[in-house]
Amino acid sequence: MSVIDVVPMTRAHIDALMPFEREMFGAEAWSADGYRAELADTRHRYYLAAVDENESLLGWAGVRVVGDTAEILTVGVVPQARRQGIGGRLLAMLLDEATRRGAVEAFLEVRVDNTAAQQLYEQARFVRVGIRRGYYAEGRVDAVVMRRAI
C-alpha cells in the first residue's frame, strides 16, 4: 500500500472528487458548488481528503457540528482504494474533530442497501436508531439512521 496522507479538504480537491461523487451517489450526489459552499462554512463544517504520495484523491469525508451534536455528512472512498482502512481513518478523524468542537454524540444516515458502509459505521461503534422511509433515490430507498456517543 502506498503512503496515504489525510489533509484538510480544499477547493482544489473538488474537481478530482466530482466524478467519484457522481458515480457513487448518483441522484444524491452533491454538486461542485455545493462542496464549495460546504468548505466555506468553517465554523460548523470540517472536511478531510485522503491523498496518496502523488496527491491523487483516494477519499473524502465531512462533518457538521452544531452545539453538542455532530452529523457525519459524507464519507467516500474511490473504488480502487476501498478495503484499505481509508474510510475508517477518515471517520475516526472526523469524530476526533467533532469532539474537539464540543460534540458528545454523532448521527448519520446511510442507504439501507449500502451494507459495506453500514459495516464501517458499526465497526466505529455506531448503532442503528431508526429508519427514514424514502430518504434516497427520489423516495425509493430508505435510510438507516445511526448514532454513537463520542
Which residues does each predicted region cover?
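Conserved GNAT acetyl-CoA-binding A-motif
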Residues: A98-E109, R132
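Structural motif
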Residues: R101, Q119, Q123-A124
